[in-house]
Each structure stands twice: as C-alpha cells, then as structure tokens.
C-alpha cells in the first residue's frame, strides 16, 4: 500500500492524505481521524527516511520520564496512554523515544534533545502543581503538549486532561447518596496536579452536604498496592473508622480490598470502595460485572488525542495553544453499598 493507493481508496487527494497524516491544521479532525484509521487498517506507513529528508524533521516524538516519578513507568495509565499515542505516531510515520531523567538532569536532557534534533516535539508527563518544565520548554522553542495541567502555571500552553475535580466530586457525591459520611480519600502524591484537583472535587462534594472533612481520612502517596493496604489498615483501626474509601488508583484499591479482607470485613457490605481508572490493556476490573465501582477515564483516547495535538503543533508552530478536557464515566460495581448503621472498628 502506497500513498497514491491509500488516497484512491479514501477518495481523497494525495495532498490531503499526506497533510492529514502530518497533522496539518487545515485538515478537519474528522478527515484526519478517517485517514489515520485507514492507514492503520491497511498497514500503510510513510517512509520516515524520505519524509525526514523532505521536511528536515527527525520524525520522532520524545517522552522524558523523571526518575522521581519512575513509578509512572509501572502505572497502567502510563502504559495505555503510550499505546494510544503510538497508534497516532505509527499512522503518521513517527517513531517514539523514551528517556529516563533525574530531576537535576531534566533541563539538560531537553536541551540535548533540542540541540541534537533527535525529536520534533515532547509529551510532558506527570505535571506538578507548579511545574518549571512548561516555561522552560516554551523558552526552548520545543513543541510540546502536557498530559495533565499545572494549576499554578499562568502562561498559555497546550494540554489534555481529565476533569479530575468533576470526577471526584461525582464519586464522593455517589458515596454520600449511599449514606456514607466517613469517606476516606487515598490520593496520589500531593505535589502532583491531578491529586490536587481530585482532592478539590472530594472536598467540594463534602461541603455541598455539610460534611466536615477529617484530616485523618485524607492521605497522599505513590499509588501502589502496599500504600492502599497500609492506609486502609490504619484507618480501619481508628476509633471512628471510615465506611467508604475513595481511591485514586485501581492498584491502590486492590490494596484497600486486601486490608478489608484481613480485617474480617466485607467489601461492598461493611466497607465501600470506589476507585478511579479501572479498565486497562493488562489490568481489568472484572468482566460482565465490574468488581469495583469506579470513575473510568478514556486513557488510550487521551494518548491518541495528545499525539494528534502535538503533530499539529509540529506542522504549524504558530498555532495558538490547544486545550482539551475529557470526562470520566461512573461505572457501578460490587464494591459499594449503603453505609452500615454502625461502623465496625478493627483492633489496632
């Protein structure tokens, strides 16, 4: 399959197909998506060497991962985001590079990528509330898109993000509707912007019902299974334990489930658990009936859209910044139920 044949199959000109694959802004999103899907279905890939010579581009996109958040490499969200982005890169004839970086070396890595011309653009992962990478990359003149947002960064930049505040407000409201008032929040690292926004949503839902937040029921760490287990074990031993847990990660929610079981309690009966992000390529939340009630975000789609956004910026560096907010679905599973009339305390 070559460009001429692909264009004929789609009933489009070769110029339109080429511009769609290269992310040119004058091609509509519907046409661009149609062309990319056809390219994937037929196995068509542009010749990167020829395109690189013709355009002066590296035909590669960079993903720089800070070692301080290296747990992201084991996070199924990161894996599915990369999988979605890779579909767009493949259709457009781009390669992808992954670089691990220490915090002190991160700026040098970006400068090196820029100086060597190894990549044409960057996807920024795991933005912090205040993130110096955004003004740095802007000053460097490197096209980039942020997966997430940085609340304290005022300058305009391109990003794609979940409505984390809305998702966690809805999740907490669902638990409040079930009669829960002692709702624990097991969040991500407090410096991460997504965790900040999720806590805002949680607090907003409590405030709307006149429920005062208890600092003893709010915790933020790296979202691992042991973290979920330890936090839930400690909270269940409180004099007035939580009757529900709102958890920022399915992996941590699995740890919460283990703590509930070890305490001799039943998830969904004695204690409710509501997780965020529950359906991944290699980690599934049950089959016909989800085990966990969860807010489900379109992670793979976010990867595709972020890659398309970046390719448009590479094709036309003068474009104004683009932003996109995606919504989460509330999926009802077996892990939630009405609040018990009297919470069961677990001996410490």
PLM region spans:
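N-terminal helix-turn-helix DNA-binding module of bacterial transcription factors
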Residues: 1-59, 347-348
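Short acidic/polar active-site loop segments enriched in Thr and Asp
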Residues: 13, 59, 120, 181-182, ...
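Alpha-helical recognition/docking segments in bacterial nutrient-uptake
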Residues: 60-64, 68-173, 177, 235-237, ...
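Hinge/beta->alpha junction and helix N-cap segments in small-molecule ligand-binding domains
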Residues: 67-80, 98-107, 160-170, 186-233, ...
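Short acidic capping loops at alpha-helix termini that bridge into adjacent secondary structure
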Residues: 181-182, 213-217, 267-273
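Flexible loop/turn connectors
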Residues: 233, 237-348
């Amino acid at each position: 399959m070559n460009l001429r044949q692909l264009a004929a199959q789609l009933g489009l000109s070769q110029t339109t197909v080429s511009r769609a694959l290269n992310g040119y802004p004058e091609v509509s999103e519907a046409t661009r998506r149609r062309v990319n899907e056809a390219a994937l279905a037929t196995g068509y890939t542009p010749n990167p060497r020829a395109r690189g010579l013709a355009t002066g581009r590296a035909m590669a996109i960079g993903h720089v991962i800070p070692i301080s958040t290296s747990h992201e490499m084991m996070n199924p969200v990161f894996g599915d985001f990369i999988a979605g982005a890779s579909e767009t890169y493949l259709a457009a004839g781009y390669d992808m590079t992954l670089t691990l970086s220490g915090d002190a070396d991160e700026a040098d890595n970006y400068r090196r990528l820029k100086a060597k011309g190894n990549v044409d653009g960057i996807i920024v992962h795991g933005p912090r509330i205040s993130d110096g990478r955004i003004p740095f990359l802007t000053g460097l003149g490197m096209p980039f898109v942020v997966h997430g947002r940085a609340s304290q960064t005022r300058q305009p930049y391109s990003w794609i993000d979940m409505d984390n505040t809305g998702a966690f407000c809805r999740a907490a409201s669902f638990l409040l509707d079930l009669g829960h008032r002692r709702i624990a929040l097991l969040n991500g690292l407090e410096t991460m912007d997504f965790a900040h926004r999720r806590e805002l949503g949680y607090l907003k839902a409590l405030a709307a019902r006149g429920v005062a937040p208890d600092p003893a029921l709010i915790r933020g760490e790296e979202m691992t299974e042991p973290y979920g287990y330890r936090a839930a074990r400690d909270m269940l031993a409180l004099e007035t334990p939580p009757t529900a847990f709102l958890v920022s990660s399915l992996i941590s929610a699995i740890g919460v489930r283990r703590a509930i079981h070890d305490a001799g309690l039943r998830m969904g009966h004695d204690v409710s658990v509501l997780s965020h992000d529950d359906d991944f390529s290699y980690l599934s939340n049950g089959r016909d009936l989800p085990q966990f009630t969860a807010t489900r975000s379109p992670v793979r789609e976010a990867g595709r859209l972020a890659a398309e956004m970046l390719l448009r910026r590479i094709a036309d560096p003068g474009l104004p910044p683009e932003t996109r907010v995606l919504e989460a679905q509330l999926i009802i599973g077996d892990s939630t139920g009405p609040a018990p009339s009297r919470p069961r305390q677990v001996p410490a």
